[in-house]
């Protein structure tokens, strides 16, 4: 393989421990030292739930929470450490933090009832999106500080301005997962969490956090779900009598074929809760439709895939607005130079 044996041996350690976890069938069976070692090796609650509880569900929310509850019961909690920015040449008292199970203790003090908010960043960049999310994240942090709130940022992309530790009161350079965000919330006890400025990754966490009674600032997670879930959004437009291209939720290939016979090609395949239109495609024939439906179902396993009539050579006009208490306070209208659907 031309891969150094050192790396292969480390990977084998992880695979061996995966097999060890698979020997258990309930979380209560796992000895505390085994569960602790699994966390030290980097296994997430999601992975532990998958290997121990043998669940094939893609969501795993219930299982993740069960592993979390068992961890907390056994007092297996992550430590919070500072990231040194001066190569350990002298004590470094930055607010640049990460979580680990390899050691114990906190490098900082936590105080209850602090006036603070957590902002979830955009995570990994992809071509065509993310810089705007970073701009929004930085503005959210600055606004929170101006309003007298302690600003806490969770993001792991070193290319962003929001991961400059001078920008906020505390920066957690860590993953934007359900598990890790809950870890930070448990420690910080914020007044609220802002998910609306980080793009798709925070949006995907909104409903899960909402179900754990985490206060989400801004747009309600229920309304985020109504916009992100293609089926719910299209059904809402129908209910409100707002014109839209003909559409159908994917239930079976027979229903898809009936829809195609009715509207003809081209059609637009639209998965839900995806980053920057991932797996969203225009199909012009049966072969493309089958191929793109498989791709869309793969990236959007938990949510419906919607097929819409695709209108060619049409203008696309976009409206972005900010509302407060049911009234629009700021908005912008733009017309795309290219035809609708190109971007």
Predicted regions and their residues:
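N-terminal beta-alpha lobe that positions the nucleotide/phosphoryl donor
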Residues: 17-37, 44-55, 62-65, 73-343
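Alpha-helical transmembrane segments of multi-pass membrane proteins
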Residues: 12, 37-38, 69
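Helix-turn-helix DNA-binding helix
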Residues: 7-10, 60-67
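Accessory DNA-binding and partner-docking regions appended to nucleic-acid-acting proteins
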Residues: 3-9, 14, 43-44
């Amino acid at each position: 393989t031309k891969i150094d044996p050192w790396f292969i041996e480390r990977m084998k350690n992880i695979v061996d421990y995966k097999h060890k976890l698979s020997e258990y069938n309930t979380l209560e069976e796992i000895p505390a030292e085994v569960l602790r070692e699994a966390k030290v090796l980097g296994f997430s609650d999601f992975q532990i739930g998958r290997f121990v509880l043998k669940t094939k569900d893609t969501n795993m929310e219930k299982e993740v929470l069960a592993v979390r509850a068992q961890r907390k019961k056994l007092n297996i909690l992550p430590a919070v450490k500072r990231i040194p920015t001066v190569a350990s040449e002298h004590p470094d008292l930055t607010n640049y933090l990460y979580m680990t199970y390899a050691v114990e203790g906190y490098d900082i003090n936590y105080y209850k009832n602090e006036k603070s908010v957590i902002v979830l960043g955009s995570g990994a960049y992809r071509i065509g999106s993310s810089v705007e999310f970073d701009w929004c994240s930085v503005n959210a942090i600055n606004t929170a500080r101006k309003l007298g709130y302690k600003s806490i940022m969770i993001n792991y992309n070193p290319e962003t301005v929001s991961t400059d530790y001078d920008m906020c009161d505390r920066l957690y350079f860590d993953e934007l997962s359900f598990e890790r965000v809950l870890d930070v919330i448990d420690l910080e006890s914020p007044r609220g969490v802002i998910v609306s400025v980080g793009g798709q990754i925070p949006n995907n966490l909104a409903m899960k956090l909402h179900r754990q009674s985490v206060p989400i600032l801004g747009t309600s997670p229920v309304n985020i779900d109504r916009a992100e879930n293609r089926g719910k959004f299209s059904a809402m437009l129908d209910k409100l009598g707002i014109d839209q291209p003909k559409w159908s939720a994917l239930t079976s290939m027979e229903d898809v074929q009936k829809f195609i016979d009715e509207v003809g090609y081209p059609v637009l395949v639209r998965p839900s809760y995806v980053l920057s239109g991932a797996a969203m495609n225009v199909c012009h024939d049966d072969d493309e439709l089958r191929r793109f439906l498989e791709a869309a179902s793969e990236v959007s396993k938990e949510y419906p895939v919607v097929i819409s009539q695709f209108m060619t050579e049409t203008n696309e006009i976009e409206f972005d607005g900010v509302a407060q208490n049911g009234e629009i306070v700021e908005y912008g209208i733009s017309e795309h130079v290219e035809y609708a659907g190109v971007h």
